[in-house]
Amino acid sequence: MSEIVLSLEDVVAGYGRAAPVLRGLSVPVRAGEVVCLVGPNGAGKSTVLKVASGLLAPRSGRVLLAGRDVTGLSPQRLLGLGLAHVLQGHSVFREMTVAENVRLGGFTVRDQARLTARIEAVKELFPVVRERWNSMAGLLSGGQQKQVEFARALMLEPSVVLLDEPSMGLDPRNTQVVFEQIDLMRRTGVAVLLVEQNARRALEMADLGCVLDLGRVHISGPARELAADPRLGRLYLGGAPAT
């Protein structure tokens, strides 16, 4: 079994003085695996990503990255330690070229040879980046822009990538491409913590599924088994699985 590269341990977190959204949540993420968070609206899925990425400090509990306690560190510090975050929606800079967008992901790389090597690596992973390198990012389709975001996130060779609703607003064909690219990340050894509106499809390709309810992990287990469970389908996944 691969090592745990990201771990949220007994996390309590919320916003302002309101009641906590996360109430003692624990989630492990192993190297080269996709962990998918599912559950009803308000269960705390996106809050988990905010805590993991440093956007929201927990009230209690710990976040460990490669065994190191990184609770409360800024997103910039976490990026330098190997954790990247692809935000919900489209975060490309539309008035910049694909090349300029991708290079932003390597802004801390001072060694030109290493920077060139990373650019070639992401071009190999994401063909649209190579093909549209000098195009304005705003001219790309939604699915192509998402691939540019993935490429930018991988420029610093993170061990963990957080993905928040990566297929939001995409048609079925581009959604399929996004899932293929997530699988490609996994096969390169990157760990992925995923929140996805297309919950059943995400569980079918993930390794571990965690069903959140009322700020806790209600059920966890092999993701494909959860996707096929008719009880979970009715409660959380928009109906029973097709037979």
Task: Name these PLM-found stretches.
Residues 38-40:
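The feature captures the beta-strand-to-loop junction immediately N-terminal to the Walker
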Residues 157:
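Conserved catalytic motifs of ABC-family nucleotide-binding domains
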Residues 16-17, 98-117, 125-127, 221, ...:
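ABC-type ATPase nucleotide-binding domains, specifically the catalytic core motifs of the NBD
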Residues 53:
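Helix-to-loop junction immediately C-terminal to a conserved catalytic motif
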Residues 136-140:
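Conserved ABC ATPase signature
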Residues 61-68, 81, 114-119, 221:
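Conserved ABC transporter NBD signature motif
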Residues 153-154:
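ABC ATPase C-loop
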